[in-house]
Amino acid sequence: MSTLDSPSLEVRWDGPRATLLVDGAESSCIDTSDPTYLDFEYMQHATCALQATFPSSAPLRVLHLGGAACALPWAWSLLFPSSRHTVVEISPKIASFARETFDLPRSPILKIRIGEARAVIDSLRGSSFDVIVRDAFAGESL
């Protein structure tokens, strides 16, 4: 049994590819040799939609509700070099584990805010984002 402050975290490595399991559920997959490679199909689809909508030079402001190992914001920060990403992660343990384990970009490229998504969104009133990604899971469901 886990709590939001103390989930069970495990990384399974397959060569340069790392899959983060949170409480036994696959949560993120990062290819450390090519962070633009996205293993999860829904992330591939979201990336196709973003690339079809915006030029790679677009200075996008993206809000990610949920982050885990931050595979999607890391990939997008490389595919859209002028983009800035704010990740809202409910678990401080997951956020610090991701920062310690992976070579994630630092602020201002990729900021990680700890908190419950609704509360953080309320604190961001007056801010604007070009894209908002809902990527928060509880167990194996959204």
Label each residue range with its predicted role:
Residues M1-F54, L78:
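Rossmann-like AdoMet
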Residues Y37-L142:
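The AdoMet/dcAdoMet-binding core of the Class I SAM-like
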